[in-house]
Design a protein with these regions (language model features):
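Short catalytic/ligand-binding loop motif for oxyanion handling, primarily in non-cytosolic enzymes
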Residues: 14-17, 70-73, 113-119
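C-terminal interaction surface of TIR/SEFIR-family domains
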Residues: 111-203
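Short beta-alpha junction loops
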Residues: 68, 97-116
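Short loop/turn segments at strand-loop or loop-helix junctions that form parts
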Residues: 32, 61-69, 110-111
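Conserved TIR/SEFIR loop-to-helix hotspot centered on a Trp-containing motif
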Residues: 69-96
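Conserved N-terminal substructure of TIR/SEFIR domains
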Residues: 1-60, 170-203
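Short, charge-rich binding segments
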Residues: 53-54, 95-99
Length: 203
């Protein structure tokens, strides 16, 4: 694999993270996750520290979407988001700084979330076609992901792949062709849609 990956995941999903580490060559994955709060009100500083100390030279972030990886997990005893680390990892992944380019982001839907995320199809009243129902929202993912999967403003009755920055795949499909999906996420970094990436003011 030619693109170095950073894995953003909830500790509950350690099993799947370990499987990815086994799948990749050690040179292709950063075996480290954000594990401390960065005490600063300066968003630029926070993102630059995470890029420097954690994401380093990665170019694609793999976001494991499990049953506790959503925006709606609430806060901890200190009033901080329970998924603070994932939020910050995705923010830093999207950050296009002076010494780095943003990462491509590939959301990998874990098996216990298939039915929550993939909800069949519907017949469109606007175009008459059939669209897949994909539930990417605060109940399933972090807002940094959903806001860059369903990017607004948007015209039309559905989003094409060219109209999304974040990409999505089932765990089983990813395992069958990991390089294909990683390459696809990597290529988003220079695609026109990268100019529509949203990082700030999402909450």
């Amino acid at each position: 694999m030619k693109h170095k990956c950073f894995i953003s995941y909830k500790k509950d999903d350690q099993y799947y993270r370990d499987k990815l580490v086994e799948l990749f060559d050690s040179a292709d994955v950063i075996d480290k996750s954000l594990n401390r709060f960065i005490e600063s009100d300066d968003g630029e500083y926070i993102m630059s520290v995470i890029r420097r100390d954690y994401l380093k030279d990665s170019t694609v972030t793999l976001f494991l979407i499990g049953s506790h990886s959503s925006e709606n997990e609430g806060n901890d005893w200190y009033g901080r988001p329970r998924n603070y680390f994932i939020q910050r990892e995705l923010q830093a992944s999207l950050y296009n700084g002076p010494r780095n380019t943003r990462n491509g982001i590939l959301g990998i839907v874990l098996p216990n979330m298939y039915d929550e995320v993939y909800d069949g199809t519907n017949q469109c009243d606007v175009c008459g076609g059939t669209h897949r129902i994909v539930n990417i929202n605060d109940d399933t993912v972090i807002r940094e992901f959903s806001s860059n999967y369903y990017i607004k403003p948007h015209e039309g009755c559905a989003w094409s792949e060219d109209e999304r920055y974040c990409t999505l795949v089932k765990w089983s499909d990813f395992l069958s062709k990991p390089e294909k999906y990683i390459d696809f996420a990597y290529d988003k970094r220079t695609a026109e849609i990268s100019n529509m990436v949203k990082i700030r003011n999402l909450r």
